[in-house]
A protein has these predicted regions:
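ABC family nucleotide-binding domain
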Residues: 1-152
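C-terminal boundary and immediately downstream tail of ABC-type ATPase nucleotide-binding domains
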Residues: 149, 153-174
Length: 174
């Protein structure tokens, strides 16, 4: 009940499908939970929203509707919306898998900054360059099982399992 609600309030989530409200502006997407859930004053919520939208590089899009933004921009709005609730932990589920290749880096760059600022993040990703750069730990899973857990350097330089070696040989060919 209440304990679960309190825990959820400390966890931000960003999914591959951005889950923005299509009928709300970008600014309103970020302020909605601040006003309705956190009971923040509207002006204060709007200022925080603009600060966060600036942080992820889409503050100039604040008055637009989600359909007017690229996928990469929408995903950065989703990150700003999650950050607005001041979570202790951010969960990312394949945040770049639905994006065009040229949009991927703009989302990953924001996530790298968050990691370097000390945000605790759990990220499901196939973006190995990003994982290597941003992670403190790599947990390699296959078929629902944890096969390896290590530092990024150890995982990429000395994978322990045949499955990890095979995966890395296929994904790191270029």
């Amino acid at each position: 009940g209440k304990e679960l609600a309190n825990l959820r309030a400390e966890v931000g989530m960003v999914f591959q499908s951005f889950n923005l409200f299509a009928n709300k502006t970008i600014r309103e997407n970020v302020t909605l939970a601040l006003i309705k859930v956190r009971h923040m004053d509207k002006k204060e919520a709007e200022q925080l929203a603009m600060d966060l939208l600036a942080r992820v590089g889409v503050d100039s899009q604040a008055s637009k509707m989600p359909s007017q933004l690229s996928g990469g921009q929408q995903q950065r709005v989703a990150i700003a919306r999650a950050l607005a609730m001041r979570p202790k932990v951010m969960l990312f589920d394949e945040p770049t898998s639905a994006l065009d290749p040229e949009m991927i880096n703009e989302v990953l760059d924001v996530m790298v900054v968050l990691a370097h600022e000390g945000m605790t993040m759990i990220c499901v990703t196939h973006e190995m360059g990003f994982a290597r750069k941003a992670a403190d730990r790599i947990v390699f899973m296959s078929d629902g099982q944890i096969l390896e857990e290590n530092t990024p350097d150890e995982f990429f330089e000395h994978p322990q399992t045949d499955r990890a070696k095979d995966f890395l040989s296929k994904i790191l060919t270029h």
